[in-house]
């Protein structure tokens, strides 16, 4: 034998030998090559004794030596050269090892049973769940039915070491209960048969012999194994699915009881043989985590509640906190990566953002946060023009808020209007503080109130003029227009002023009835003129003051306010509404009563106030009761406002009705106009003035807030 091995090892350098190995799967189990006649002869001799290598005579060995020893030497040398040329390091040892396997295979045929046993163990291991969870190659070779070609199995290194005889491999596979061979004998797959019977409620202390004794019966097939699993469960394995079914039926129908208890049995599939998906799940758990996402998905879902509290807390603080919610959902698909900390990692950034929002309190309305800066810049520009810069920022904001109030007020009675105005005052104060000290918390509160106002206000908006409604809707519902309002002073401020005029008309039932200012304020001088020119009162049309373009000094504004103050009728022309807007040179846009439509460009604006005036007209009946209520409210506001104004401290306590009488001093005028106008008018211009005054002092805000809250506590509790 040794001599034969050596001789054949020399011959392994021949190319025909390599071809022999290539032809093994094709059904040449004996490795019989036909390329060269000499090799064919020797191979035929060896093939003629497949089981009798022990019978190989020394003559055969000598024949090998005689025939091949010289050629083997040359072929070996040439083979070495070729291998070196190819950069391969296949030494003769490897070839002899392979050849030894071939000879070993044929020699092991002597003990076929041993070979079959080894093959069976190896094949069953290859198709075991443990191996399938790691053997990606074998899984990749499976088709949709988990069938693997038998030649693929035969080519596996572990099998080749044992045998290359596909017929023998097929025979072993067919004899194994662990695998299933197709009818043609070409493919094999793991067996899905349920071969295990589970006995429940049998204590672990029960001897194995007693459990096995249950199945010792003619009607029960042979038990392959019996073992205790866990939780008083015993696994009894049978050879096949049919055996397990038969044993199960036997227990149910014949035995029925064990140890005085009814037998609780069920059939379980051998966990080694689950469907392909089962292998993939196992595989994914050990290797590919992305495939594991289905199993991991419950964990993100479970962890979601951990994240939700933050969402809700954020939501309570910030109405727009829905923005963080999408992020978690975008992140959750990534969460399946087993480290659940990833979810926590994401949530922590979210919490950080929410904290930042809580600190700034302006985050929910980032555009609003930017607004103050725009207004401050615009205010600086106005200051260069000679108008009070601080007023502009608050004016635009207040105008927007007044606009909201106006939208709501047209349908509201005078009392409600009064209650609303006090609320507006604290808001204005807050925003003044925002402009003065950039206190964003106050700004946020003001905006919050604005939102509160906005929620109910959209309903009465229907009463507004049809033309302005689109812009009003944009202002009310969409924040983007609000920042634009600062930049677009002429358009949006005009709208705001008109609205404020409407509000003025609604609230100034008592004041505006007597006098209506019809003169448009051309400029600072023009404003004085308008103050001096009261017109006959036409209560039906509310004055449509569109002075937003006017940017005048406080004196002019005061004069305007004075002129507006004498108005006792619901039709306050709201000339004072002319706010210190950036454009002084546009006097044509100054307030003009609806009756005297002096400015044709205001036709649109007039139309808007006309409808508003209609609402005012509807509200005119409450004019009479309202004067009494409005006056005390004015006094309260004047009290609150007077301390707030540092510039004009002299006139903090002056009565509201007298403001028109006080054109002498700007401070008194401003206060009077402010007091008189704040409650009834809600005019953006006056509110702006108020904001200027407030901006000088931050402390009086608390007082005004108190007054406003006290006045309208029943309707609302702004926070």
Swiss-Prot record:
Keywords: Acetylation, Cytoplasm, Methylation, Phosphoprotein, Protein biosynthesis, RNA-binding. Residues 199-277 form the RRM domain. Residues 21-55, 363-398, 437-470, 529-562, 576-601, 615-719 are annotated as: Disordered. InterPro entries: La_dom_prot, La_HTH, LARP4_RRM, RBD_domain_sf, WH-like_DNA-bd_sf, WH_DNA-bd_sf. Residues 107-299 are annotated as: Interaction with the poly-A tract of mRNA. It comes from the Eukaryota. GO terms for molecular function: RNA binding. CDD domains: LARP_4 (cd08035), RRM_LARP4 (cd12707). Residues 654-673 have a biased composition (Basic and acidic residues). GO terms for cellular component: cytoplasmic stress granule; cytosol. One of its GO terms (biological process) is translation. Residues 376-389, 460-470 have a biased composition (Low complexity). Residues 439-448 have a biased composition (Basic residues). The modification N-acetylmethionine is found at residue 1. Residues 529-538, 578-599 have a biased composition (Polar residues). Residues 12-21 are annotated as: Interaction with PABPC1. The modification Omega-N-methylarginine is found at residues 363, 681. The modification Phosphothreonine is found at residue 644. It is found in: Cytoplasm, Stress granule; Cytoplasm, Cytosol. The modification Phosphoserine is found at residues 387, 396, 500, 578, 592, 642, 717. Residues 109-198 form the HTH La-type RNA-binding domain. Interacts (via N-terminal region) with PABPC1. Interacts with RACK1. RNA binding protein that binds to the poly-A tract of mRNA molecules. Associates with the 40S ribosomal subunit and with polysomes. Plays a role in the regulation of mRNA translation. Plays a role in the regulation of cell morphology and cytoskeletal organization. This is La-related protein 4. It comes from Mus musculus (Mouse).
